[in-house]
Amino acid sequence: MHKTKRTLTLLLAALLLSACSGGNTTDTTADGTTDANVDTAETAPVETEITVELPDKNYGDAEVMFLTVQNTGMDQYSSHEIYTDEMNGQLINDAVYVRNGQVEQALGVRIAESKQPDAEKVARSNLTAGDTTFDVVMPYMNRAIDLATEGFLMDLSTVPYLALEKPWWDGRVTKDMVIANKVFFSTGDISILDNECTMVMFFNKDLITDYSLESPYELVREKRWTIDKVGELASAVTHDVDGDGKMTSKDAWGMTAAFNAPVSFYIASGERIVNKDADGNLQFCLGTDRSVDVLTKVFSLCLGDDALYNAGYGDAVTIFNEGRALFVTFALTDISGLRESEYG
């Protein structure tokens, strides 16, 4: 029974992903070169059809339960891409409803979801007790790693029909997540949170104008956008607004830096914390001259005199919207809090 349920669950995951793709085709060329005598404007691209290899089978209205994250403090970090019980006119909600209906009809299943604030703890407790209520577990990645090291997760590369090489999976993530030739987690079109939680840096357009600062857009185009340049711009804005001789959340800052901003800057600089050896095992790789240089610059930027570090989401939004921060580091999904500002 458990084997049948497991196969059904993984078939469902594969079909959920293929339904997200909408039957798209990918434009490709034979070798990436162009004949100088060919009018390229009239050459039609070759279309390669993306196929879904799934068995023709009906599972008799079996329920497949997803365990997902409910962030009670910040709902934008909750899962909204797995289940909804009705259409409401919102794009993501209605797309999920339609997709699930297609999958349920194709496989003869019922998709269900349990949202939990501590999804990984619930998964661990159930699995330890031999409870098979949950078929697919989708905690935050750092928590998923804990479950993998404790032996609770399957090697996805061994799963029939999951087809991690398909374009609806994020191939880069899958490649990076291979540990000792096993893949315990991946992501792709099945999740929008992995995109919405991308760390970004917003800037206040009004402050750029008021202080006659260089445009971040132009700096990027001219390939002069560096950590040093960010620090230079930030220092031009920082000042003691209330004149009490102390720098607090009531003053003006070059940057409000989230708790995870240093790691984001470090990785964005092209550095890594671990690499893999020939056998796919992780090797600690901090300590090179460049990594030390990058860390020094990152810490100076995020923890220095021109940055308010780890102020919390609410304070950071208030400071930015009141024009008292040039830069703010957030996840992309946090953009909803900045609607009162002219940001870039």
Regions found by a protein language model. Give the residues of each.
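C-terminal motif of bacterial Sec signal peptides marking the signal peptidase cleavage site
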Residues: 16-19
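Immediate post-signal peptide segment of exported/extracytoplasmic ligand-binding proteins
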Residues: 44-85, 104-105, 240, 244-251
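Short, polar/charged alpha-helical segment
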Residues: 75-108, 201, 206
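Periplasmic solute-binding protein
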Residues: 79, 148-151, 172-218, 256-278
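Extracytoplasmic "Venus flytrap"/periplasmic binding protein-like
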Residues: 106-178
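Glycine-centered hinge/linker elements that transmit conformational signals in sensory
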Residues: 231-234, 264-312
